[in-house]
């Protein structure tokens, strides 16, 4: 009896102490991610200059656990004007490179720093330049370009699903409205291969 108990305990110890961990951040891995968050501060009600953004991206992992990212993003912000709010929308495409600089031993958490190029289109008040009070908007709809610096945390929930938290600063130099936008967002990444 003691012999079977000893073998059983030894078997359980072998199973728990030498666990194999999932392979993550391997060259050639691909992922799809969706993110949503707030821009230019945290405003919970729509009576202030409320701003939000949503985005989707495709990632391809390279050597040294870095990755290329391409994607698109929509940013919506309202600016106060007298007793109304004027909406501004930006539609941008992104292409960038993210460098992993920190991870834990179990490969569950990854911290990356990314640099991206952005290009897109900006529209004010849905292209309506005449306001209800008779004023005319001088801001024109225009093509925008610039870049973004991103700090991103990936926390793997399963082998194929990761929770994302990121903070980024967008600089769009050709924008008529605002050159810089700070964004904070949460999202999910799905590994597809």
Task: List each model region and its residues.
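Extracellular loop and loop/strand-boundary signature of outer-membrane beta-barrel proteins
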Residues: 41-44, 79-86, 133-139, 171-175
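Membrane-spanning beta-strand positions in outer-membrane beta-barrel proteins
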Residues: 31, 67, 110-112, 156, ...
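Bacterial N-terminal signal peptides that target proteins for export
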Residues: 1-7
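Predominantly the C-terminal beta-signal and adjacent terminal strand-loop region
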Residues: 75-78, 147-193
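Gram-negative (and chloroplast) outer-membrane scaffold detector with strong preference
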Residues: 57-131, 190-193
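Short glycine/proline- and aromatic-enriched beta-strand/turn motifs that initiate or cap beta-hairpins
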Residues: 20-70, 189-193
């Amino acid at each position: 009896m003691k012999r079977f108990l000893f073998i059983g305990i030894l078997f359980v110890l072998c199973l728990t102490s030498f666990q194999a961990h999932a392979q993550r951040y391997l060259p050639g891995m691909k992922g799809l991610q969706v993110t949503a968050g707030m821009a230019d501060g945290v405003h919970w009600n729509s009576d202030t200059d409320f701003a939000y953004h949503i985005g989707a991206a495709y990632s391809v992992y390279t050597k040294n656990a870095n990755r290329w990212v391409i994607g698109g993003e929509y940013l919506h912000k309202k600016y106060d004007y007298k007793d109304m709010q004027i909406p501004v929308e930006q539609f941008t495409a992104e292409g960038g490179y993210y460098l992993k600089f920190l991870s834990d031993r179990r490969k569950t958490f990854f911290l990356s720093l990314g640099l991206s190029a952005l290009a897109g289109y900006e529209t004010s008040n849905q292209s309506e330049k005449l306001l209800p009070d008779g004023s005319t908007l001088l801001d024109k709809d225009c093509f925008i370009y610039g870049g973004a610096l991103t700090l991103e945390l990936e926390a793997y929930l399963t082998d194929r699903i990761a929770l994302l938290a990121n903070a980024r600063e967008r600089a769009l130099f050709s924008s008529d409205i605002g050159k810089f936008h700070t964004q904070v967002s949460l999202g999910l990444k799905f590994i597809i291969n």
